[in-house]
């Protein structure tokens, strides 16, 4: 079973770049574009790791 990583970033290009690299290395990746989406994803299933944009806007 692969480790699951949640990428939280409002920049689609960054999410796609990081996601592609991680998937190529065998990780399962979920994405969220904002704070609210991130909370929904976390409530569905807690990821093993989260990569978070430190300047993420709430919303």
Regions found by a protein language model. Name each.
Residues 1-6:
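Non-catalytic signal-transmission and effector/linker regions of two-component phosphorelay proteins
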Residues 52:
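Redox-cofactor binding/interface segments in oxidoreductases and associated redox assembly factors
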Residues 9:
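Conserved acidic carboxylate
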Residues 31-49:
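Acidic, metal-coordinating helix/loop segments flanking the phosphotransfer/catalytic sites
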Residues 12-30:
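Two-component/phosphorelay signaling modules centered on CheY-like receiver
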Residues 23, 47-48, 59:
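Residue-level marker of structural boundaries
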Residues 55-57:
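The short loop immediately C-terminal to the conserved phospho-acceptor aspartate in CheY-like receiver
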């Amino acid at each position: 079973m692969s480790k699951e990583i949640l990428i939280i970033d409002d920049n689609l290009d960054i999410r796609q770049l990081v996601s592609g690299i991680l998937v190529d290395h065998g990780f399962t990746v979920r994405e969220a574009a904002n704070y609210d989406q991130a909370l929904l994803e976390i409530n569905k299933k807690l990821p093993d790791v989260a990569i978070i944009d430190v300047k993420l806007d709430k919303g």
